[in-house]
């Protein structure tokens, strides 16, 4: 009987560790004024560990400028990850603004309006 491949589980562990380390690196070592209060929401790593999509949200500020700042600092952050992670290949980082929280707020507003209009009708 063949053993199950542990690669997917390892990929999740690597992505989780990248998320934790990036959070610390951005908060403590990144000095770019365009990058404000950033929260790393998720990290998706390709099966060959060559690339990682890093989804982030922003408390305040311009998401476009923050994305530019993070993508320009990707090499610096990757070097910091290389010192912390003990894996052969540290992925190239691609930062993407996560609009999930904004969409959730918009959806909540739509639901609240629908409930309010239904209450007026009754």
Curated annotation (Swiss-Prot):
Q: Which UniProt keywords apply?
A: Cytoplasm, Ribosome biogenesis
Location within or outside the cell: Cytoplasm
Q: Would the keyword Cytoplasm be found if you checked this record's keyword annotation?
A: yes
Cellular component, GO annotation: cytosol
Q: Which InterPro entries match?
A: KH_dom-like_a/b, RbfA, RbfA_dom_sf
Annotated Gene Ontology MF terms?
A: ribosomal small subunit binding
GO biological process entries: maturation of SSU-rRNA
The protein's predominant localisation is: cytoplasm
Q: Fetch the Gene3D superfamilies from UniProt.
A: 3.30.300.20
The entry describes its oligomerization and partners as: Monomer. Binds 30S ribosomal subunits, but not 50S ribosomal subunits or 70S ribosomes.
HAMAP family cross-referenced by the UniProt entry: RbfA
Q: Can you tell me which family this protein belongs to?
A: Belongs to the RbfA family.
Role: One of several proteins that assist in the late maturation steps of the functional core of the 30S ribosomal subunit. Associates with free 30S ribosomal subunits (but not with 30S subunits that are part of 70S ribosomes or polysomes). Required for efficient processing of 16S rRNA. May interact with the 5'-terminal helix region of 16S rRNA.
Q: Which PANTHER family does the entry mention? A: RIBOSOME-BINDING FACTOR A, CHLOROPLASTIC-RELATED (PTHR33515:SF1)
Query: What is this protein's name?
Result: Ribosome-binding factor A
What organism does this protein naturally occur in? Albidiferax ferrireducens (strain ATCC BAA-621 / DSM 15236 / T118) (Rhodoferax ferrireducens)
Q: Which gene encodes it?
A: rbfA
């Amino acid at each position: 009987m063949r053993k199950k491949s542990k690669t997917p589980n390892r990929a999740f562990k690597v992505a989780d560790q990248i998320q934790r380390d990036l959070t610390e690196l951005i908060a403590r070592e990144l000095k770019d004024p365009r990058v404000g209060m950033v929260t790393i929401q998720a990290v998706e790593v390709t099966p060959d560990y060559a690339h990682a999509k890093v989804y982030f949200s922003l408390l305040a500020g311009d998401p476009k400028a923050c994305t530019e700042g993070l993508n320009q600092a990707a090499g610096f952050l990757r070097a910091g990850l290389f010192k912390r992670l003990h894996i052969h290949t540290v992925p190239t980082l691609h930062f993407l603004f996560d609009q999930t929280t904004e969409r959730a707020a918009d959806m909540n507003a739509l639901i609240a309006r629908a409930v309010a209009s239904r209450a007026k009708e009754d």
